[in-house]
Amino acid sequence: MIAHNLGYPRIGDNRELKKACEQYWSGAITQQKLQDVAKAIRTNNWLTQKDAGLDLIPCNDFSFYDQVLDMSFMLGLIPERFSSLLQKKDLTELDIYFAMARGYQKDGYDITAMEMTKWFDTNYHYIVPEFRKDQKFSPISEKAIREYTEAKVVIGKAAKPVLLGPVSYLLAGKEKEAGFNRIELIENLLPVYTKLLATLQQNGAEWIQLDEPFLVMDLTVQERKTYETTYTALRNLFPSLKFIVATYFECTGTNIDIAAKLPVDALHLDLVRCPSQLSDILTPAFISSNTMLSLGVVDGRNVWKNDFSTSSTFITKAIAALGKERVMIAPSCSLLHVPCDLDNEKNGNVLTPEIKNWMAFAKQKLHEVAALKKLNRAPMQSEELRLLKANTESIENRAKSKLIHKQHVKARVKAVQPSDSQRKSLFKSRQQIQEKALQLPLMPTTTIGSFPQTDEVRANRAKYKKGDITLAQYEDFVKTEMTKAIEWQEKIGIDVLVHGEFERNDMVEYFGEQLKGYVFSENGWVQSYGSRCVKPPIIYGDIERTEPMTVAWTTLAQSLTKKYMKGMLTGPVTILQWSFVRDDQPRRDTCMQIAFAIRDEVVDLEAAGIKIIQIDEPAIREGLPLRRENWETYLNWAVECFRISASGVKDETQIHTHMCYSEFNDIIKNIAAMDADVITIETSRSQMELLDAFVDFNYPNEIGPGVYDIHSPRIPTTDEMADLLNKAMHVLPVRNIWVNPDCGLKTRRWPETEAALINMVAAAQKIRKEITTVV
């Protein structure tokens, strides 16, 4: 048996990479210092995995920003708009790499960033490769080779280079012009992959992990064929190189026949998301082959301890069919998606000892993988018996704990009625009522909710949490920041204001801190994109709201302006998606509990005089099962949960929702079924591509297509945003259009925020002047 890992968090135990990248971008440190920080993280990661007892350890899983962008750079896939930067002698390879991710706006250049989207159904984002017809590939970076050479010095032959497989790389991208299918580029791409693999082999690599997560997706006949021909070609070119093809996040399903027949040395299956596929793969044909089977039995996407007894049943079954020599044990996917080390959680008042004992972070999961290998070697020694006993006690303690269950919460969910998810009137009637009540201008301007969380804001929050300042002092500071933000919004002419969310650390954690059934970590950070890290709250039990969460701050903000102040809430599906969720009941039940908690908050905001309430659901699409056949069930309960949260108010109260990073052309009917009065969406990076859905679907409610990309520091011009609004007007009735950024502005700095929003208001005013009739 071989114990191995698919990938490890690259942010560092204390977010060293985030801090170093941001310091480099601001000019505070040199590139050499940034590289030194990166090397220290890589070395620590490799030694941590070696010390845990793993036989094969991934390398090239580190990234300064994103592993898909790394692959693009290694393959020489640099969009034409960045080509001029290659001639700038003062820009290094890393500078151009960052420019592709973040845009470049200096020295007379004004280059937009590449598109970013969610990595399958996770909370991680990747930079989308851009393909053109007859795309040529030419290696620019030798990152994988450098990092393998570096790893070999630290961990020797255990080093296993990890690459995004060629077919998944193509499928992860987008065609940037018509007239071709990106999968056809495999003939141009394969020679560059071949060169990379050859160099790795020449440098001593024995195992290569090729991640092919698209093997769990619905594939066309052409895509299925491409998998077969690609891996046959690689096998013929590299008969002695050991390939492990890794699938994860879902069942291989109808693709299992392809996966099982690939001429590779090992196939990895995610048995956490899809335990049934172990039986599916153990057919006579697979058993009679020489392919090893990697069992993804340790959950790479959640924080709960592995149940050794359950995992051992899978391992025992595989050993019985294949023999120990053909079995590998691993996490279900890369550990990128979980925090680094549970040992960094030292405050028992934050993460209570009882609940902490139910959990495992990345480092602990490595030890679980190694322990499972030991436990399945017969006969068990005293060490193995001790490991099994401790694990069994922890699993049983969690199952029996009185902390988890609240019968009155369960009863409310069980008693849900259709009327709980229905507004009093249809949208057409509500729109007329709201227009009369609110008296907003045509194409009203607003922002999504948050304003920049400056160093001063973060420092004051940290001081309060450490006890260095009192609650009163902290609240005075927040009120001062909020007042400045409100006055500034009024000054530049924004129509519907927000309070800026200066009191909130994170749009999910803030609510989790005030809901029963949640627990938190101090250092449970995971990477969202680039240098952005999030610290997901942890749902361990039934969810209950025992008192108002946002009413005090929102009503205070409303008292500071005569304009409308939006109440700002996070929706139930997003709270679910962006948390580590209990795994002892269906996700639908947990989401329904959250929905009723948010509903109670919405009703209280309305009673306090708030006329416009936004319930953010940026994660609604990422919750979609990866297979279309499973979509309907999820969408039914997700939409129902949103409607429950929003349907307790009068017709006069305008409900907004927001979705960012969302490509939901294919679920537009379900988005309409949410029945929000106004939806704001991410569209600018894709140049309003999202609005294509409205050509075929007459979206009934109001909509704010984002007119500028907040994920880049680049400042859009007034004309650019006016052009995007003109595109929207060709698809949507003018009376239904709102003007807003793509997403919240928390991660931006004030100078770029101010400049961009001033231009945005000017764009709206320009379009209003040009409109002579209301469509």
From Swiss-Prot:
InterPro entries associated with the record: Cbl-indep_Met_Synth_N (IPR013215), Cobalamin-indep_Met_synthase (IPR006276), Met_Synth_C/arc (IPR002629), UROD/MetE-like_sf (IPR038071)
Binding-site positions, L-homocysteine: 448-450, 501, 616
Protein name in the entry: 5-methyltetrahydropteroyltriglutamate--homocysteine methyltransferase
Function, in words: Catalyzes the transfer of a methyl group from 5-methyltetrahydrofolate to homocysteine resulting in methionine formation.
Binding annotation for L-methionine: 448-450, 501, 616
EC number in record: 2.1.1.14
Family of this protein: Belongs to the vitamin-B12 independent methionine synthase family.
Catalytic reactions on record: 5-methyltetrahydropteroyltri-L-glutamate + L-homocysteine = tetrahydropteroyltri-L-glutamate + L-methionine
Cofactors that this protein relies on: Zn(2+)
Binding-site positions, Zn(2+): 658, 660, 682, 743
